[in-house]
C-alpha cells in the first residue's frame, strides 16, 4: 500500500495545499463520495460519523476543502491502520472508542450509535440537582 501511494504521488504530483488536486490525482471515487457526505453534513448541520481509515482520509479532504466541516464530524474509533492515528491527530479529533478494531464494514460506527443514544438519553432525561433536592455544595469549616 505504501509503495503504491508513493508511486501515485511521484507520478501525479498533487499539490498538498490543494485538497481538490490531491483528491483528483491520488484519491478514488470512494474517498470523493465520502468527502461529499462530510461536506453535506456541514452544509445541512447534520453530524456525520467517521469510521475507519478511508473515511478518515475522506474527512481530512472535506476539512481541507471546508474547515467548518470539522464541527460536524464524529470519530467513532481508532483504526488499527498506523496512519489513522496520524490523521486523527492532524484533524484534531479524538475517537470515542478505543478497542483496537480492524474489522471493516463500519463496525466502529455501529458500535458508536448505542453510546450516542445513551448520551442523548442522559442529556435529555437526567434530573438536575434541584429536581432531586440536592443541596448546593458548601465548604466545610
What are these regions (language model features)?
Residues 1-141:
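N-terminal loops that bind phosphate or other acidic moieties
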Amino acid at each position: 500500500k505504501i509503495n503504491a501511494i508513493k508511486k501515485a504521488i511521484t507520478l501525479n504530483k498533487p499539490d498538498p495545499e490543494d485538497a481538490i488536486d490531491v483528491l483528483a490525482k491520488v484519491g478514488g471515487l470512494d474517498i470523493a463520495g465520502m468527502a461529499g457526505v462530510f461536506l453535506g453534513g456541514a452544509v445541512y448541520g447534520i453530524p456525520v460519523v467517521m469510521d475507519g481509515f478511508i473515511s478518515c482520509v475522506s474527512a481530512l479532504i472535506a476539512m481541507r476543502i471546508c474547515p467548518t466541516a470539522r464541527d460536524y464530524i464524529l470519530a467513532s474509533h481508532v483504526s488499527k491502520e498506523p496512519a489513522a492515528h496520524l490523521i486523527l491527530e492532524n484533524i484534531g479529533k479524538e475517537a470515542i472508542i478505543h478497542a483496537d478494531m480492524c474489522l471493516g464494514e463500519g463496525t466502529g460506527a455501529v458500535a458508536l450509535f448505542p453510546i450516542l443514544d445513551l448520551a442523548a438519553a442522559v442529556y435529555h432525561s437526567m434530573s438536575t440537582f434541584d429536581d432531586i433536592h440536592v443541596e448546593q455544595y458548601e465548604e466545610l469549616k
